[in-house]
Design a protein with these regions (language model features):
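A charged, aromatic-enriched C-terminal amphipathic alpha-helix characteristic of glycosyltransferases
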Residues: 110-145
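Short acidic/histidine- and often glycine-rich active-site loop of Leloir-type glycosyltransferases
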Residues: 27, 69, 82-100
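Short hydrophobic beta-strand element within catalytic cores of glycosyltransferases
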Residues: 77-80
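Short alpha-helical donor nucleotide-sugar binding micro-motif in glycosyltransferases
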Residues: 39-40, 47-52, 133
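Nucleotide-activated donor-binding/catalytic signature segment of Leloir-type glycosyltransferases, i.e.
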Residues: 24-44
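Aromatic "clamp/platform" in nucleotide-sugar-dependent glycosyltransferases that forms part
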Residues: 60
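A conserved mid-protein helix/loop that constitutes part of the nucleotide-sugar donor-binding site
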Residues: 1-11, 22-26
Length: 145
């Protein structure tokens, strides 16, 4: 997941990593100044995300990134590299920032409105996605006949 790209950044404030995995012990040793919270789900995850000023997403390979929408739903702007997953979700200045310089993206994301992040994520709620799906059924049916 390219965590060192985030962990090595010179940024103001505290760095927190939510989650676990086989590399967790080694990361704790290599980055003792970082707060590793371990895995979180549900309300605990949403609450932890909402405490952040920016959600830094260092992955270069994720194809969608549901976690980006989870952060936005908690009102947290995203900073990420301009690669496949984030490019389809992050809109510059609206819900986060993309840059090949992840530090620059993170610092710019501090200026993004938390409310605009929440509003954007609302377009991906179950109700909204169901509505979009149903609205596309009628045109697809007409094309099939």
């Amino acid at each position: 997941k390219n965590l060192p790209a985030f962990l090595d950044l010179d940024l103001p404030g505290e760095k927190r990593v939510i989650g676990g995995g086989p590399a967790l012990t080694a990361l704790k040793v290599a980055y003792p100044e970082v707060c590793f919270t371990g895995p979180k789900t549900g309300e605990e995850l949403a609450s932890s995300l909402a405490e952040a000023d920016v959600f830094v997403f260092p992955s270069l390979t994720d194809t969608f990134g549901v976690v980006l929408l989870e952060a936005m739903a908690s009102g947290v702007p995203v900073a990420a590299f301009p690669v496949t997953g984030p490019k389809y979700i992050v809109q510059e200045g609206l819900n986060g920032c993309l840059d090949n310089n992840l530090r620059s993206a993170a610092l710019r994301a501090l200026e993004v409105s938390r409310e605009s992040c929440r509003a954007f994520a609302g377009d991906y709620s179950w109700a909204s996605c169901t509505r979009q799906f149903v609205n596309n059924l009628a045109p697809a049916r007409r094309l099939a006949h």
